[in-house]
Amino acid sequence: MSNVPAELKYSKEHEWLRKEADGTYTVGITEHAQELLGDMVFVDLPEVGATVSAGDDCAVAESVKAASDIYAPVSGEIVAVNDALSDSPELVNSEPYADGWIFKIKASNESELESLLDATAYEALLEDE
């Protein structure tokens, strides 16, 4: 079973979301997602300043197996991207919940968080796959 940190929120598309002290949200892909994709070779990051809607594809993770879209779990403005992934995309594999984060978003509609899964619900989703 994949590691599913209790403090995070999750999307059905296997992104995770963590609220930061400054009110922004850090987004990445889950350990389960990176296990399915395999070794990362490139991450196509979104543009800082871009406005996205929940469910929009805004980044791409390319692995030795496949390229997979990464979706915005909430609507808002991209305020930062993880530039370290340009040189070290494998951070998504080795540290999916830490240094392997993909982007930060300033949510424009925090009520969208209610549609995300908590750790228990995400674990149940994984068991059903």
Swiss-Prot record:
Coiled coil: none annotated. Pfam families: GCV_H (PF01597). One of its GO terms (biological process) is glycine decarboxylation via glycine cleavage system. GO terms for cellular component: cytosol; glycine cleavage complex. Its cofactor is (R)-lipoate. Keywords: Lipoyl. InterPro entries: 2-oxoA_DH_lipoyl-BS (IPR003016), Biotin_lipoyl (IPR000089), GCV_H (IPR002930), GCV_H/Fam206 (IPR033753), GCV_H_sub (IPR017453), Single_hybrid_motif (IPR011053). Transmembrane segments: none annotated. Disulfide bonds: none annotated. Binds 1 lipoyl cofactor covalently. The glycine cleavage system catalyzes the degradation of glycine. The H protein shuttles the methylamine group of glycine from the P protein to the T protein. The glycine cleavage system is composed of four proteins: P, T, L and H. Belongs to the GcvH family. This is Glycine cleavage system H protein. The lineage of its organism: Bacteria, Pseudomonadati, Pseudomonadota, Gammaproteobacteria, Enterobacterales.
